[in-house]
């Protein structure tokens, strides 16, 4: 009985089982109660809820699976969208390039941008860069808070530039649908980048959140286990092994660690975005300055009072393609006295055509002086398309197209009927010849001042213009300024109006004109005013002007040269006077020959006067006075000048 009682003793049975378990470690449970238990129910520590722990691991795995599945779908869809956007951008870039600089495709769809410059092309190119970067760096490991901030800033800056453009009436009426959409599209590209960054941040946090919660639990357990003996820790280490990193390590790796390749990619992307930010900062300052200058010169326009001055914008055709800026002084609308007695007959309206790198604001000062001296009764100036305040023309453009546009703007839109005495200076001499030839019915006489010869429109005119010399010039041909043709290739004496800038150089200047740094220095350092920047000495830095010069250069040897030669016969019965610079004739015999040829375009040439001074005769006192006398003799008013 005793033996049986001993055998059935529960305490003894537990002791024996304990001895067996100690002798057979493989039979021990996977979780050691005195190490991983939580709660107050255990002698060695709180008891562990094994079901909850297993359920938590399963939940984390399922959650991460769903998140990563959504992330893969997001990456797949975003790649498709960005590739489509880049394709649209590329097609739009090519279309804009062709439409703005070679052939106006937009007119087929009824669109127009009368404020066209190089800005649209630059913005589209930047949007391509932005979308390409969104595509290449749209990865979880490449998320950067700085990139998100840059995208938001660039998006806001682009919209701010558009707001500045719409702030004043002049630019608001001219930018059109295409120009507006360009700004919105560029802003949308940066907005897409910000959205993608936001999604990357979302997936980053979604992946880290369950891992972070598990990390907190593991941290609490680790804190409790630090109170255990070293022998228990060694036994647990031998029992579980080293294994893979804990969720804590994985979370820290996702949150704080990047590979070297990722750091290089992030740095490259943020550097390019920062350079774009600098570009947009300068672009915004340029837009702000141009907006201020344009407002100062246009907020009182149109001035429709017929006397003593008139200034307004007039369309060039019935389709209202674009407008020319026309300014007149005197009573240019009075045609009633044309049939009166000779003593009461009105003088013809002096219609001045400015040069290639100026407007009437600079080169017509000698005519303005005659008006203030009451030697001429009335005169008109206009800015050619893309110059000054006139609208940007559609491509292509030629001399005949401008002449036809001017006729419509003057006669049909402005109701200024003439008659006119046309005066052309520099490149404007060619425009004057074509306009006069096409409008002999309303032109009384023509005067050419330092006018271009049509041969200057050809590509190789510089070599023929340069005088023979001893090789003291240098254009990089042989070190002595010669090119094997016996001519001196020193071009430094050529005026900027004559020395043609090739298309690539004009294009390069046009791209950089979007920054406007030369315009900024014009008021910061040179203290020039708004008139100087819009149609004065600094006009040559304006993007719209450079685009017009590019259009003129592209068609000069094709369309414009043919326009001048085809209309030459119509000038044979037009009363004409020629004024040439003495310095230019001395420096180039060919220039003198060309000026002589101009005297032969009409059978009624009144005189050929070689005046003192250089090409810009309005800057030389004696040369200016001599030119004024030629004009007064041409219109029969020299007596007024001699009497005074």
Swiss-Prot record:
InterPro entries to which the protein is assigned, alphabetical: AB_hydrolase_1, AB_hydrolase_fold, DUF2417, Meta-cleavage_hydrolase
Domain AB hydrolase-1: 348-619
Compartmental location: Vacuole membrane
Basic and acidic residues bias spans: 9-26
Major place of residence: membrane
Segments of this protein annotated with the region Disordered: 1-39, 225-251, 469-492
Ranges that cross the membrane: 91-111, 123-143, 148-168, 175-195, 272-292
Keywords from the UniProt entry: Membrane, Phosphoprotein, Transmembrane, Transmembrane helix, Vacuole
Cytoplasmic side, ranges: 1-90, 144-147, 196-271
SUPFAM superfamilies linked to this entry: alpha/beta-Hydrolases
Membrane topology: Multi-pass membrane protein
Protein name: Uncharacterized vacuolar membrane protein SCY_4679
Provenance organism: Saccharomyces cerevisiae (strain YJM789)
Highest classification ranks of the organism: Eukaryota, Fungi, Dikarya, Ascomycota, Saccharomycotina
């Amino acid at each position: 009985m005793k033996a049986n009682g001993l055998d059935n003793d529960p305490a003894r049975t537990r002791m024996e089982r304990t001895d067996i378990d100690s002798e057979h470690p493989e039979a021990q449970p996977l979780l050691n109660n005195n190490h991983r238990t939580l709660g107050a129910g255990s002698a060695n520590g709180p008891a562990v809820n094994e079901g909850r722990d297993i359920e938590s691991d399963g939940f984390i795995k399922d959650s991460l699976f769903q998140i990563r599945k959504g992330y893969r779908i997001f990456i797949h869809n975003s790649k498709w969208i960005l590739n489509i956007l880049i394709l649209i951008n590329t097609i739009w870039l090519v279309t804009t390039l062709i439409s703005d600089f070679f052939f106006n495709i937009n007119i087929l769809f009824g669109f127009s941008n009368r404020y066209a410059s190089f800005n649209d092309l630059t913005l589209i190119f930047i949007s391509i860069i932005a979308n390409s970067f969104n595509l290449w760096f749209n990865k979880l490991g490449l998320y950067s808070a700085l990139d998100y901030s840059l995208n938001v800033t660039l998006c806001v800056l682009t919209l701010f530039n558009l707001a500045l453009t719409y702030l004043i009436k002049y630019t608001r009426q001219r930018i059109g649908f295409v120009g507006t959409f360009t700004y919105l599209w560029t802003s949308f590209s940066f907005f897409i980048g910000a959205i993608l960054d936001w999604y990357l941040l979302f997936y980053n946090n979604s992946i880290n959140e369950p891992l972070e919660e598990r990390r907190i639990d593991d941290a609490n357990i680790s804190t409790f286990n630090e109170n255990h003996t070293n022998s228990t820790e060694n036994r647990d280490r031998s029992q579980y092994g080293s294994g893979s990193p804990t969720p804590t390590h994985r979370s820290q790796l996702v949150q704080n660690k990047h590979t070297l390749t990722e750091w290089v990619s992030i740095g490259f992307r943020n550097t390019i975005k920062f350079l774009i930010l600098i570009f947009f900062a300068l672009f915004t300052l340029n837009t702000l300055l141009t907006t201020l200058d344009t407002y100062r010169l246009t907020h009182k326009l149109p001035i429709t009072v017929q006397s003593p001055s008139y200034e307004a914008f007039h369309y060039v055709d019935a389709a209202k393609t674009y407008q020319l800026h026309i300014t007149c002084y005197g009573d240019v609308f009075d045609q009633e006295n044309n049939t009166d007695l000779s003593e009461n007959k009105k003088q013809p309206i002096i219609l001045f055509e400015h040069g290639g790198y100026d407007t009437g604001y600079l080169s017509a000062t000698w005519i303005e002086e005659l008006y203030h001296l009451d030697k001429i009764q009335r005169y008109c100036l206009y800015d050619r398309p893309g110059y000054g305040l006139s609208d940007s023309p559609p491509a292509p453009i030629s001399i005949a197209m401008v002449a036809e546009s001017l006729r419509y703007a003057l006669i049909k839109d402005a109701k200024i009927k003439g008659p006119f005495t046309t005066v052309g200076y520099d490149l404007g001499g060619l425009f004057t010849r074509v306009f006069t030839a096409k409008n002999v019915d309303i032109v009384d006489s023509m005067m050419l001042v330092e006018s271009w010869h049509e041969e200057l429109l050809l590509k190789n005119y510089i070599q023929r213009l340069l005088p023979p010399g001893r090789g003291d010039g240098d254009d990089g041909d042989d070190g002595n300024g010669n090119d094997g043709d016996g001519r001196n290739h020193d071009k430094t004496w050529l005026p900027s109006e004559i020395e043609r800038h090739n298309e690539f150089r004009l294009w390069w200047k046009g791209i950089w004109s979007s920054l406007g740094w030369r315009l900024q220095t014009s008021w910061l350092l040179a203290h020039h005013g708004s008139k100087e920047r819009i149609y004065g000495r600094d006009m040559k830095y304006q993007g719209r002007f450079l685009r017009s010069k590019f259009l003129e250069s592209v068609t000069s040897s094709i369309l414009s040269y043919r326009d001048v030669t085809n209309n030459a016969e119509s000038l044979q019965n037009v009363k004409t006077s020629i004024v040439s610079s003495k310095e230019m004739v001395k420096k180039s015999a060919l220039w003198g020959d060309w000026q002589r040829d101009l005297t032969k375009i009409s059978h009624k040439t009144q005189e050929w006067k070689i005046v003192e001074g250089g090409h810009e005769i309005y800057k030389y006192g004696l040369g200016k006075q001599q030119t004024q006398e030629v004009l007064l003799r041409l219109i029969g008013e020299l007596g007024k000048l001699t009497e005074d």
